Amino acid sequence: MPVSSSLAYKNYDYDYDSIQPYFYFDNDDEDFYHHQQGQTQPPAPSEDIWKKFELLPTPPLSPSRRQSLSTAEQLEMVSEFLGDDVVNQSFICDADYSQSFIKSIIIQDCMWSGFSAAAKLEKVVSEKLASLHAARKELISDSSSNRLNASYLQDLSTSASECIGPSVVFPYPLTESSKSSKVAPSEPMLVLDTPPNSSSSSGSDSEDEEEEEEEEEEEEEEEEEEEEIDVVTVEKRQKRNEAEVSDSRYPSPLVLKRCHVSTHQHNYAAHPSTRHDQPAVKRLRLESSSSNNSSSNRQGKQRKCTSPRTSDSEDNDKRRTHNVLERQRRNELKLSFFALRDEIPEVANNEKAAKVVILKKATECIHSMQLDEQRLLSIKEQLRRKSEQLKHRLQQLRSSH
């Protein structure tokens, strides 16, 4: 890469000499920038190509073709689109015109991002905005002095007074319905009394008010639903209590006879084979649970007598028996570990010894005991042989005498 092209990033005054050969080749008839000979070569890959376009002049801006509407035309358009507040505000005040004008002039493109072009664009935009504000002020003065506007406001006030009341639509007693009905007819007056220059703010205020009213109505409906639910539940509870009282006052003999049979049900939680083998604490728990079950059976005789025994109750009984057997197995395993710990001298006094430690110490103790056994057996064999030798010698001495 030549040195002259590398200096283009640091100083923009040398752009005419350093960048021109990459776009304008040597021509004797049209020599615009008086470039040097021998520099006609394509641009390097690392060269910033988009900076070259800053040297090109920007074309003149075309004038705006949009014409401003008169007051009568604006009022006619408002009367056509009276149902939609957003459309009314957009046609009366033309709030989005300045934004669309700015977006149409300032084009975000690398071809028009030069410093001189940006300055010209800012100047044109400021002039157009100033002329636009002046035209709007004239429209405000014309509309305030116009009689059509006053008659239109009168028509709106009469139409607002003829609106249907919310009590006709919502027959339920609402706490804040009067407040909402008072706020509703004053909305169009507030929207139209504001000048056209503040159309966006008035539109947003009206939308906010509508949203607040909708939220209030939803909250009121939710409160009504909650109140209705409370009333229904209270009535159901009262009916249920009355039914229970009537059943308790006038019990039938057939139901009492069947309940007497259901009191002798078998307790699946306590097996006769394993009841006496359980520890005292577990036995007390089972007895207390059985007493609680019997008391609950006595309290709810009618419901248990009328409803037959289902598969769910059988599953619960099976699960209960399984839990009892599992507790017994765990207790037996724990007791066996405690007994093994007491037999090992290294862990006998350690009550908090883990099961792994107990097993390791037990294996070590077994190996040591096996070695002692072999040693003692060898000593025993030696002593036996020695005793035999002594007996044989004793016999020899006796025979010699």
UniProtKB/Swiss-Prot annotation:
<keyword id="KW-0238">DNA-binding</keyword>
<protein>
    <recommendedName>
        <fullName>Transcriptional regulator Myc-2</fullName>
    </recommendedName>
</protein>
<feature type="region of interest" description="Disordered">
    <location>
        <begin position="286"/>
        <end position="325"/>
    </location>
</feature>
<keyword id="KW-0539">Nucleus</keyword>
<dbReference type="GO" id="GO:0000981">
    <property type="term" value="F:DNA-binding transcription factor activity, RNA polymerase II-specific"/>
</dbReference>
<feature type="short sequence motif" description="9aaTAD">
    <location>
        <begin position="76"/>
        <end position="84"/>
    </location>
</feature>
<keyword id="KW-0804">Transcription</keyword>
<dbReference type="GO" id="GO:0005634">
    <property type="term" value="C:nucleus"/>
</dbReference>
<dbReference type="Pfam" id="PF02344">
    <property type="entry name" value="Myc-LZ"/>
</dbReference>
<dbReference type="InterPro" id="IPR011598">
    <property type="entry name" value="bHLH_dom"/>
</dbReference>
<feature type="compositionally biased region" description="Acidic residues">
    <location>
        <begin position="205"/>
        <end position="230"/>
    </location>
</feature>
<keyword id="KW-0805">Transcription regulation</keyword>
<feature type="glycosylation site" description="O-linked (GlcNAc) threonine">
    <location>
        <position position="58"/>
    </location>
</feature>
<feature type="region of interest" description="Leucine-zipper">
    <location>
        <begin position="376"/>
        <end position="397"/>
    </location>
</feature>
<dbReference type="Pfam" id="PF00010">
    <property type="entry name" value="HLH"/>
</dbReference>
<dbReference type="Pfam" id="PF01056">
    <property type="entry name" value="Myc_N"/>
</dbReference>
<dbReference type="InterPro" id="IPR012682">
    <property type="entry name" value="Tscrpt_reg_Myc_N"/>
</dbReference>
<dbReference type="InterPro" id="IPR036638">
    <property type="entry name" value="HLH_DNA-bd_sf"/>
</dbReference>
<dbReference type="GO" id="GO:0046983">
    <property type="term" value="F:protein dimerization activity"/>
</dbReference>
<keyword id="KW-0325">Glycoprotein</keyword>
<feature type="compositionally biased region" description="Basic and acidic residues">
    <location>
        <begin position="233"/>
        <end position="247"/>
    </location>
</feature>
<dbReference type="GO" id="GO:0003677">
    <property type="term" value="F:DNA binding"/>
</dbReference>
<keyword id="KW-0010">Activator</keyword>
<dbReference type="InterPro" id="IPR002418">
    <property type="entry name" value="Tscrpt_reg_Myc"/>
</dbReference>
<comment type="function">
    <text>Transcription factor that binds DNA in a non-specific manner, yet also specifically recognizes the core sequence 5'-CAC[GA]TG-3'. Activates the transcription of growth-related genes.</text>
</comment>
<feature type="region of interest" description="Disordered">
    <location>
        <begin position="177"/>
        <end position="251"/>
    </location>
</feature>
<dbReference type="InterPro" id="IPR003327">
    <property type="entry name" value="Myc-LZ"/>
</dbReference>
<comment type="subunit">
    <text>Efficient DNA binding requires dimerization with another bHLH protein. Binds DNA as a heterodimer with MAX.</text>
</comment>
<dbReference type="InterPro" id="IPR050433">
    <property type="entry name" value="Myc_transcription_factors"/>
</dbReference>
<feature type="compositionally biased region" description="Low complexity">
    <location>
        <begin position="288"/>
        <end position="297"/>
    </location>
</feature>
<feature type="domain" description="bHLH">
    <location>
        <begin position="317"/>
        <end position="369"/>
    </location>
</feature>
